[in-house]
Design a protein with these regions (language model features):
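Acidic/histidine-rich catalytic neighborhood of metal-dependent amide-processing enzymes
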Residues: 1-22, 228
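Metal-dependent amide/peptide-bond hydrolase catalytic core
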Residues: 24-230
Length: 230
């Protein structure tokens, strides 16, 4: 078995991509009047401390590695994309959530990275939140947990797609695809190859150049001929 995932790679043969873990952290504090901050637990403040922790984790891996210079950026990254909490200025916010993610190099253990996050929450941040009240805390809602991809250049699928596209080299990308799932969970050798550029993805006026579509069509014609022969 083999698998070809048709995400936008400019028809380059991609054998490795980063994994991705994304989640929403729900912070539950205790409300009160802002003139008496000691009588409540400020969910926004603790959520902000969590965001700073994630930023520092990202800085740690940027500085200390592991590194792979064929990826851009060349290290595991952490990102906080959304923070929302509170109702008005003079009320201690009871609720806040943070949407965050990390994108790990394929050889950087996702479970180890998740462990760093939960260790910080369970052993540092939540105990601080519960110094006065024990009905406060943090819940993690997992949005996606996608393994990275690391397919060898000597795999049959890699050699086949290189031959059919005329590629001389393989590549690595920082965005994620279902390829990691097929490879890790289904034990199916997988590569990513498709028309268009990721630089035009997820933004207004997405487009794929006609030349890219023509190259993809030619590739599919050749692939179909190979499959018919087999």
């Amino acid at each position: 078995a083999m698998c070809i995932v048709g995400e936008p790679t400019n028809m380059q043969v991609i054998t490795q991509h980063k994994g991705k873990y994304s989640a929403r952290a729900h912070f539950t504090g205790r409300s009160g009047h802002s003139s008496l901050p000691g009588e409540g637990v400020n969910a926004v403040e603790f959520a902000s401390e969590f965001v700073v922790f994630l930023r520092r984790l990202g800085q740690k891996f940027r500085n200390e590695g592991p590194h792979d210079d064929e990826f851009v950026p060349n290290h595991t990254t952490f990102h906080s994309g959304v923070i929302h909490g509170g109702t008005q200025l003079n009320i201690i916010p009871q609720n806040c959530y943070v949407d965050f993610e990390f994108r790990n190099l394929p050889n950087h253990d996702r479970n180890e990275l998740k462990g760093l996050i939960f260790d910080y929450l369970d052993n540092t941040l939540i105990p601080q939140m519960r110094e006065t009240y024990d009905d406060v805390g943090v819940e993690i809602e997992v949005v996606s947990d996608m393994p990275g991809l690391a397919t060898g250049d000597d795999e049959e699928v890699t050699r086949l797609v290189m031959e059919l596209t005329g590629a001389n080299t393989t590549g690595k990308v920082s965005f994620g695809t279902e390829a990691g799932v097929f490879s890790a969970m289904g034990d199916i050798p997988t590569v990513v190859c498709g028309p268009g550029s990721i630089e035009q993805a997820h933004k207004p006026d997405e487009f794929i150049e006609l030349d890219q579509l023509a190259r993809c069509e030619a590739f599919l014609d050749k692939l179909l001929a190979v499959l018919v022969r087999k």
